[in-house]
């Protein structure tokens, strides 16, 4: 099992992935005007690829969604990285909102 983060992603976005026995899971996070855009892609060694795209308007809904994802148990390091990177992006979004209001 491995976990990777893409440091070459554009500012305001993150790409994370983990590979295990059953295949690979990838997440793409990006700040957007309305909150946080998330893509979740599951790439099994056999079978169909699954992709979800979701936009969250607040951090609490994202955290609930993230904590209900099975990766929490299958790839705990990816889960921790996903929460940490999302928190950083939410913080960047809050800072941008605060500076535009001044």
Please annotate each region the language model reported:
Residues 1-8, 45-102:
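Mixed-charge, Lys/Arg-enriched low-complexity segments
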């Amino acid at each position: 099992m491995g976990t990777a983060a893409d440091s070459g992603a554009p500012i305001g976005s993150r790409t994370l992935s983990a590979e295990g026995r059953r295949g690979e899971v990838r997440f793409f996070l990006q700040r957007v005007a309305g909150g946080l855009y998330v893509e979740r892609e599951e790439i099994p060694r056999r079978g169909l690829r699954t992709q979800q795209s979701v936009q969250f308007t607040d951090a609490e809904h994202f955290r609930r969604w993230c904590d209900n994802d099975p990766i929490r148990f299958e790839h705990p390091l990816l889960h921790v990285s996903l929460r940490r990177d999302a928190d950083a992006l939410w913080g960047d979004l809050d800072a941008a909102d605060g500076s535009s209001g001044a």
